Regions:
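Short glycine- and basic-residue-enriched patches
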Residues: 279-412
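Structured mid-to-C-terminal alpha-helical surface segments
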Residues: 1-44, 54-66, 70-304, 309, ...
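Glycine-rich beta-strand-to-loop/alpha-helix junction loops that act as flexible
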Residues: 46-50
């Protein structure tokens, strides 16, 4: 098990509580245990918000539960689940020291509104910062009552901790487009704060955005399975007040900074226009920095002792969420001051310097900032509408999709 200090340091860097970071750490090892279990590896398909965070976008909100679609409905059985999770817990304890007491596991077998069997589980754990009393729990949602439209994919999860296996942790997960479509359907079904946050954030990632026609095919298939039509904006309007009331309570602890709900709701007309086949606005390239190379590395090579990586992670989060970020910066004249910026990309100059390409919020001027001259970074709660393409999504460890294919082969 990693040291307590590693969790505390990660919490400080991400502006989250140690318990949220610890849960993310344990979730990674729980996924490892599930994916390595012979009876589950090819039968459990990972989906939902935690899937989006762990498999596709590391700058996504931290999520707290594990959702799976099961190929074998017979595995939704209390006796079976208690046995396999006792086995998973033993293996995780032996490999990491994380304690997952078998006697504290709960699996409630229920029927969904369609009369099909489902399971809501709770798995307790003791990690690096957990107390011995009132152990935290991971929630499990298991169903076999779902149509899998696209072939699932094998994905390496994001597990940025020092005890990560050399070979990584690979899981069977929804195709990105299907994960996006199921979130869109959930927004129409439940209109919960996290569903709105998820759909808007997925849409904002222009590089991964599917073509609207094929995406609508997948969404239509997912909706038809539930007896729903293709969602429209008017379906959501009656739920707006409840969504606004729960916005902070549901999301604030999962994010370093939270935008006002209006900045998400106001983007829905554009999203539904895109779904109907409309063309999304095309942003022009930033007027400066084109001669420099865009940096896509998840971990950016920096001089020994440099503070920059933690700053980069916060900048990426802010940019992805369209939040202004406040930087503490020393300019060419040696003057140190703070300023709010819109962050767009990291680039490496011909001299080898790492530059943050941004727009100064005060006057709208494009600027470049030497990363080594940044002494502090703080995401604000002020939103901005991008003027230029945001090129801060890292590539490499995770299966970040790039402009999803224009055609899909729909499954059975």
């Amino acid at each position: 098990m990693i040291d307590r200090r590693e969790i505390l340091d990660a919490a400080a860097q991400t502006s989250l509580t140690p318990h949220v970071v610890e849960k993310d750490y344990v979730l990674g090892w729980m996924l490892a245990g599930i994916s390595r279990h012979a009876e589950l590896a090819d039968n459990w398909i990972f989906k939902g918000g935690t899937c989006l965070k762990k498999c596709f976008f590391e700058t996504y909100r931290f999520s707290e539960d594990l959702d799976f679609t099961l190929r074998d409905a017979g595995q939704i059985d209390e006796t079976f689940l208690k046995r396999v999770f006792a086995e998973i817990g033993e293996r995780i304890r032996d490999e990491t020291g994380i304690e997952i007491p078998a006697q504290l596991q709960e699996f409630e077998i229920l029927q969904n509104p369609r009369g099909k069997t489902m399971c809501q589980g709770k798995v307790s754990y003791k990690g690096p910062v957990s107390s011995s009393h009132g152990l935290p729990r991971i929630k499990l949602d298991l169903t076999a009552d779902e149509r899998i439209v696209l072939p699932p994919v094998r994905v390496q999860i994001f597990h940025p901790y020092s005890d990560a296996p050399e070979e990584g942790i690979e899981v069977l997960a929804y195709d990105y487009v299907e994960a996006f479509a199921e979130k869109f359907r959930a927004l129409a079904e439940r209109t919960r704060p996290r569903d709105l946050y998820d759909v808007v954030n997925l849409y904002r990632n222009v590089e991964a955005r599917p073509e609207p026609g094929p995406f609508a095919e997948v969404l239509r298939a997912k909706c038809e399975f539930k007896g729903m039509g293709l969602p429209c904006l008017t379906d959501l309007e009656p739920h707006r007040a409840d969504l606004e009331a729960g916005w902070v309570h549901m999301l604030d602890h999962q994010l370093p900074a939270l935008l006002p709900v209006a900045s998400f709701w106001d983007e829905l007309p554009e999203i539904f226009a895109w779904l109907a086949g409309g063309r999304s606005p095309v942003l022009t390239a930033m007027p400066i920095g084109s001669e420099n190379v865009v940096i896509r590395d998840r971990i950016v090579p920096l001089p020994t002792g440099a503070r920059g990586q933690a700053f980069i992670d916060l900048i990426r989060f802010a940019a992805t969420n369209h939040l202004l970020v406040e930087i503490d910066y020393v300019d060419k004249q040696g003057v140190r001051s703070t300023r709010e910026i819109e962050a767009y990309s990291l680039r490496r100059s011909k001299a080898g310097d790492v530059l943050l390409m941004a727009v100064r919020a005060a006057d709208g001027q494009a600027r470049s900032y030497l990363l080594e001259k940044i002494f502090g970074v703080r995401p604000t709660q002020k939103s901005f509408r991008p003027r230029y393409p945001i090129e801060l999504t890292p590539s490499g460890l995770q299966s970040i999709p790039r402009r999803s294919s224009a055609s899909f082969r729909l499954g059975a």
